Amino acid sequence: MGTPGTSAGALFLSSASAPSRKRAAGEAGEAGVARSRQRVLDEEEYIEGLQTVIQRDFFPDVEKLQAQKEYLEAEENGDLERMRQIAIKFGSALGKISREPPPPYVTPATFETPEVHPGSAVLGNKPRPQGRDLDDGEAGEEEEKEPLPSLDVFLSQYTSEDNASFQEIMEVAKEKSHARHAWLYQAEEEFEKRQKDNLELPSAEHQAIESSQAGVETWKYKAKNSLMYYPEGVPDEEQLFKKPRQIVHKNTRFLRDPFSQALSRSQLQQAAALNAQHKQGKVGPDGKELIPQESPRVGGFGFVATPSPAPGVNESPLMTWGEVENTPLRVEGSESPYVDRTPGPTFKILEPGRRERLGLKMANEAAAKNRAKKQEALRRVTENLASLTPKGLSPAMSPALQRLVSRTASKYTDRALRASYTPSPARSSHLKTPAGGPQTPTSTPAPGSATRTPLTQDPASITDNLLQLPARRKASDFF
């Protein structure tokens, strides 16, 4: 069975030949390995090793689930040879009979979870040969002797090619930044060197300071000080005096079965006896005694109540777990055979009555008639407006109707606009009456004579002098 970790085991076996003092240091010493001492692996090898460690520590049942899946597939395909290989490979771990009573619950897994007892090694943490035949027994024993490192130790010891190349790029960028801003770090380096020289104990001949400053340098010089730059933060020195953190994976499971049947049965019986003694002689809210007296016993057995037949046992239920062959129907509240047990009034929208339905029908019909009348009136007005022109007069119209249409057509046409687009004779600035009517005298009337107010203005006078715009005044005109 090819599972992740086949080549990862060879990786850890090759690194297992390190001196024993490295293994004795433990995770605390390995976590602080410098980045330069990390071993660079291929991307596929690094991911496979990381996947193996994570699967072993956090998902130990994945291997058994994969074996179970392959066993079921082989059984479905009738591959007896594959079934035999899986049974031989996992038979030693699955064939052990536990002497402790089984748990009160049954898990759906076919392969049992290995039980962990105090003083015994964790079975899930032991690496097994994956994807190998039984002939490689020696290699499997050698692999079982060398435990795989934890996740933190693996990340501190190994890195991928992408991570290593990224670190190199960051180092090169940092060196370029220092070279570009050498003036920023030169004074800081000189100060650190001078301070280091002052801390060293010179010989007796050089203890006399010949050229010294007026005061003692107590202020530490820093290029990026906290006044002009954002502070970099205080180093967390508190973690240096604490024990290194470690993930204890065995704490996620019980060392022994906490739900023992014998212990649980005795505790339940004791709790039931105490509860019955506490409720002895008390009356519930329904007026009945909480623990009624026992019925007479015959041969150690008490009487049981006569079973009452439940109606509709053999009938088809309202809902089944089968497939729905058509659109499901909504069950109304009145059609449901179950009685509503919720006390108090319930909200329900009643169906409209016959009178209300008749009123709505009449209102809809009246509204439809009104809309039809309105549409017909609008259509007639549109047709009339389109035909109210002297050129559009029908010869079938009577003379009186033609004069009426000619007289009313002037209300819907703009004579001034028509005159601006058509040539006209010499215009006069005097006021005139509409065509066909009596003309207004051009001379000034006598004081006592009656005058007539012009009804309309000359249509040609509306568009006269439109382009004769007044000249814009200059600044010199105001002085």
Curated annotation (Swiss-Prot):
Acidic residues: compositionally biased ranges: 135-145
Biased composition, class Polar residues, residue ranges: 455-466
Residues bearing the modification Phosphothreonine: 3, 389
Residues with PTM Phosphoserine: 295, 394, 398
Compartment annotation: Nucleus
Numbered residues of crosslink Glycyl lysine isopeptide (Lys-Gly) (interchain with G-Cter in SUMO2): 145
Gene Ontology cellular-component annotations: nucleus; spliceosomal complex
InterPro entries in the record: Nuclear_protein_DGCR14_ESS-2
Pfam families assigned: Es2 (PF09751)
Keywords: Acetylation, Isopeptide bond, mRNA processing, mRNA splicing, Nucleus, Phosphoprotein, Spliceosome, Ubl conjugation
The UniProt record lists the keyword Iron: no
One GO term (biological process): nervous system development
Tissue specificity field: In the adult, widely expressed with highest expression in the testis and brain. Also widely expressed in the embryo with highest levels in the anterior pons.
Source domain of life: Eukaryota
Cysteines paired by S-S bonds: none
Bias (Low complexity) ranges: 7-19, 433-454
Residues modified as N-acetylmethionine: 1
Region of interest (Disordered), ranges: 1-38, 95-152, 415-479
Role of this protein: May be involved in pre-mRNA splicing.
Family: Belongs to the ESS2 family.
Subunit description: Identified in the spliceosome C complex. Interacts with FRA10AC1.
Protein name in UniProt: Splicing factor ESS-2 homolog
Protein's gene: Ess2
